[in-house]
């Protein structure tokens, strides 16, 4: 859709979970490895920010990278 407006559209992707300190995440070593509330769920450890994809005009690559991302957890209620 954006390519219909401009020929120079680019998109990048970065991801953040939360601050990696109390009171935002549980700092117990086991919970840092897998912060999901249910033990049978597998979540990635919390992180402040990850650069995932440089600016690109490739919409398929953007979709693929977003689709590969796992969930994490925090202490929000």
From Swiss-Prot:
An annotated GO BP: neutrophil chemotaxis
Transmembrane region(s): none
Gene3D superfamilies given in the database record: von Willebrand factor, type A domain
Disulfide bonds: 36-43
Keywords on record: Cell adhesion, Disulfide bond, Glycoprotein, Integrin, Membrane, Receptor, Transmembrane
Topology in membrane: Single-pass type I membrane protein
Recorded family membership: Belongs to the integrin beta chain family.
Assembly description: Dimer of an alpha and beta subunit.
Functional note: Integrins are a large family of cell surface glycoproteins that mediate cell to cell and cell to matrix adhesion.
Protein name: Integrin beta-2
Organism listed in the record: Xenopus laevis (African clawed frog)
Phylogenetic placement of the source organism: Eukaryota, Metazoa, Chordata, Craniata, Vertebrata
Gene this chain is encoded by: itgb2
């Amino acid at each position: 859709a954006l390519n219909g407006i401009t020929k120079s559209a680019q998109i990048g992707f970065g991801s953040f979970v939360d601050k990696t300190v109390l009171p935002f995440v549980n700092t117990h070593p086991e919970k840092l490895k897998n912060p999901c509330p249910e033990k049978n769920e597998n979540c990635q450890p919390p992180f402040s920010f990850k650069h995932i994809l440089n600016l690109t005009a490739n919409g398929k690559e953007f979709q693929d990278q977003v689709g590969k991302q796992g969930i994490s957890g925090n202490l929000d209620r």
